[in-house]
Curated annotation (Swiss-Prot):
GO MF assignments: 1,4-alpha-glucan branching enzyme activity; cation binding; hydrolase activity, hydrolyzing O-glycosyl compounds
Protein name (Swiss-Prot/TrEMBL): 1,4-alpha-glucan branching enzyme GlgB 2
GO cellular component annotations of the record: cytosol
Domain of life according to the entry: Bacteria
GN (gene name): glgB2
Pathway per the UniProt entry: Glycan biosynthesis; glycogen biosynthesis
Catalytic reactions of this protein: Transfers a segment of a (1->4)-alpha-D-glucan chain to a primary hydroxy group in a similar glucan chain
Function, in words: Catalyzes the formation of the alpha-1,6-glucosidic linkages in glycogen by scission of a 1,4-alpha-linked oligosaccharide from growing alpha-1,4-glucan chains and the subsequent attachment of the oligosaccharide to the alpha-1,6 position.
Subunit structure: Monomer.
This protein's UniProt keywords: Carbohydrate metabolism, Glycogen biosynthesis, Glycogen metabolism, Glycosyltransferase, Plasmid, Transferase
Enzyme class: transferase
Length: 732
């Protein structure tokens, strides 16, 4: 078909043509692809660097016509007598490529999807935005979509187009500020980013996809097209088993883990998810923990942040394998009867230029005003929770982990920093809310909405808050004015109890109230007692290093403290290495010091933690009082002189009970009388002074009660309290 060159550019203005050539055009579909003109169909393609292009009929494979050069910059055009399904045969300097034309496809995202994105209620965001493997009209490829409402132009770039932003500019869907493009014949594994021109015409550093489901391992920063093939889970019985409420009422003993440093091979290589499923999962099961809590595994640029400064909120870090490898690890955990909790960070994000910061050239995910949008403690940016799309982005991220990866719970990091506008700020450095107060009302509503949606869509999932203040109602339902979390870390108990146990025993009597104070508020929330990674870093030393005294006393103090914790109301959490009394504080670049288990004292502590977990899981009395005040009484709260504390834990019907008595001095107490509710023979189930744990072997065994009133109870036991030890006795 003979066509004049001017006809190839009919309807294309001079300014529009140069905007396309220079990579500034915001509506490429108005020029590229098939267009009706003068009774024929003109097809234009912009392929800088191509030597030639042929138009091929898709059905037959025959060459219809070669493309003509419409502009020497790389704009080619061809004419068809009537519209047909066609392909392009492109000749490059290094070979040929046959593909469909990305600009021959119509609108990709539905109006409902766009509406839900704008409303902040599109909870399956990774199935709409990001890179989605799919087929359109039997053409396989990848649909790219990204929210960048203030950009002048957005292109998808990757190895497939030599990272040239001129080659594949995207279509803007004005109603939602979302850019979209279908790239035929791309497959999972392709690297990509977005190239964005900001409102002022500046080309930004290429951006990783905020909703990517896979990423390159750091320090590389490209996003990766993830497969749409579903992992074949084998955990149906686990997922359909206990409800969240049943799990909350039962034993919860959490082993907190940094995946990269739990165990390293010679040479310092971290284990991958498959290897962790073979090593970590059997260990946790053998130790009797009910859950593993993983420090954040979302993609993050700086390993030294331990994952707490993530940028890929939908992508597992590539440090330990593929997304499918992570799913395999979780599946193996569930097969072993172990739940998986994930640390999740909606409070802030790092300032890396290839990430979310000023994503489209404006403060899109963050606040514009640094008094709201910059966190000086961490040099990070704060999410703008007043924006629907940002709230929806975060909630969709939470659901991604719970639904796609079968995560059993999220521990939400740095909640306090979100709840207070003046958090870690001086006067004049923060903006009050609309009522003049310091509360972040947008964050309050965000948490209520987050927890309501999670509980509605994921009945199995637990939501846990790391909230370091006394904000009221963290674990109350939203309909009762609370934030809706299931549990909260008891930071106050952790600080108080560690402060006490770090003191020389000679001074503990003066601080006795530190150990009893926690019970004043113990039932104001549903608490987890956390001895977390935060307590063994930044010069704080290891758990063992915090203990006073000589080596024997250090181990005795730590054994007694952990048994007191396991006997105290509240679910349990301990960071890896604490269960073996690792001598040095945690180093994320090194393995836990497993070789210390060759020493009896370390092996003894490990055995104690295992036995404490076993007794806790078997004994209803140690579970019921975690959240119910009728499941707890002080047996001896006021013996400051002897630094002795006694607790009674009750089963729901009070048919059985457990007595927990701690002697926090190095002086054995012989003939220590303590009141008990039941008559009969009480059996010592655990004593931290047992020889198998590294103690001196001063034990009680079976103890018959006497009809001698004590501590307001009609019966009492005549006990031997070993030095620096805790004993747990079960009622008849």
């Amino acid at each position: 078909m003979n066509v004049e060159r001017s006809e190839f550019l009919a309807g294309v203005g001079h300014d529009a043509l140069w905007a396309l050539i220079e990579g500034r055009h915001g509506d490429p579909f108005s020029i590229l692809g098939p267009h009706e003109s003068g009774g024929m169909t003109i097809v234009r393609v912009y392929l800088p660097g191509a030597e030639g292009v042929d138009l091929i009929e898709a059905a037959s494979g025959r060459v219809v016509t070669p493309f003509s050069i419409a502009h020497p910059s790389g704009l080619f055009a061809a004419a068809m007598g009537s519209r047909m399904h066609y392909r392009l045969r492109i000749t490059w300097p290094d070979g040929e490529q046959i593909t469909e034309d990305p600009y021959s496809f119509g609108l990709l995202l539905g109006e409902l999807d766009l509406h839900l994105i704008s409303e902040g209620t599109h909870y399956s965001l990774s199935r709409t935005l990001g890179a989605v493997e799919m087929a359109i009209d039997d053409v396989a490829g990848v649909r790219f979509a990204v929210w960048a409402p203030n950009a002048r132009r957005v292109s998808v770039v990757g190895d497939f187009n030599a990272w040239d932003g001129r080659r594949n500019p995207m279509r803007l869907r004005q109603s939602a500020g979302v850019w979209e493009l279908f790239m035929p014949r791309l497959a999972p594994g392709e690297r990509y980013k977005f190239e964005i021109i900001d409102p002022h015409g500046n080309c930004l550093p290429q951006k990783a996809d905020p909703v990517a489901r896979a990423s390159e391992a750091a320090p590389s920063t490209a996003s990766i097209v993830a497969s749409s093939t579903r992992f074949r889970w084998t955990d149906d019985n686990w997922m359909k088993g206990q409800s969240r409420q049943q799990r909350l009422e039962g034993p919860i003993s959490v082993y907190e883990v940094h995946a990269g440093s739990w165990l390293r091979e010679n040479g310092g290589r971290s284990l991958d998810w498959v290897e962790l499923s073979q090593r970590l999962v059997p260990y946790v099961r053998e130790m009797g923990f009910t859950h593993i809590e993983l420090l954040p595994i979302m993609e993050h640029p700086f390993g030294g942040s331990w994952g707490y400064q993530p940028l890929g909120l939908f992508a597992p870090t590539g440090r330990y394998g593929t997304p499918e490898d992570l799913a395999y690890f979780i599946d193996r955990c569930h097969g072993a009867g172990i739940g998986v909790i994930l640390d999740w960070v909606p409070a802030h994000f790092p300032t890396d230029v290839w990430g979310l910061a000023r994503f489209d050239g404006t403060a899109l995910y963050e606040h514009e005003d640094p008094r709201e949008g910059f966190h000086r403690d961490w040099n990070t940016l704060i999410y703008n929770l007043g924006r629907n799309e940002v709230k929806g982005f975060l909630i969709a991220s939470a659901l991604e982990w719970l639904e796609r990866y079968h995560i059993d719970g999220l521990r939400v990091d740095a909640v306090a920093s979100m709840l207070y506008r003046d958090y870690s700020r001086n006067e004049g450095e923060w903006i009050p809310n609309r009522y003049g107060g310091r509360e972040n009302l947008e964050a309050v509503e965000f948490f209520k909405h987050l927890n309501s949606i999670v509980h509605e869509r994921c009945p199995h999932a637990m939501m846990i808050a790391e909230e370091s203040t006394a904000w009221p109602g963290v674990t109350k339902p939203p309909e009762e004015g609370g934030l809706g979390f299931d549990m909260k870390w008891n930071m106050g108990w952790m600080h108080d109890s560690l402060s006490y146990i770090e003191k020389d025993p000679v001074y503990r009597s003066y601080h006795h109230g530190t150990m009893t104070f926690g019970m004043i508020y113990a039932y104001s929330e549903r608490f987890i007692l956390p001895i977390s990674h935060d307590e063994v870093v930044y010069g704080k030393g290891s758990l063992l290093g915090k203990m006073p005294g000589d080596e024997w006393q250090k181990f005795a103090n730590l054994r007694s403290y952990l048994a007191f914790m396991w006997g105290h109301p509240g679910k349990k959490l301990i960071f890896m290495g604490g269960e073996i009394a690792q001598p040095s504080e945690w180093n994320h670049d090194a393995s836990i010091a497993w070789d210390v288990l060759d020493q009896p004292a370390h092996a003894g502590l490990q055995r104690l933690v295992k036995d404490l977990n076993g007794f806790y899981k078997d004994e209803a009395a140690l579970q019921f009082g975690d959240f119910h005040s009728e499941g707890f009484d002080w047996a001896a709260a006021d013996d400051a002189v002897n630094s002795v504390l006694g607790m009674l834990r009750y089963a729901p019907d009070r048919s059985s009970s457990v007595l927990v008595v701690s002697n926090f001095t190095p002086v054995p107490r012989y003939g220590y009388r303590i009141g008990v509710p039941q008559d009969g023979v009480w059996i010592e189930k655990v004593t931290t002074d047992a020889r198998e744990y590294g103690g001196s072997g001063l034990v009680n065994g079976a103890v018959s009660s006497e009809s001698v009133p004590a501590h307001g109870r009609p019966h009492s036991l005549w006990l031997t309290l070993p030095p620096l030890a805790t004993v747990l006795l079960k009622s008849p």
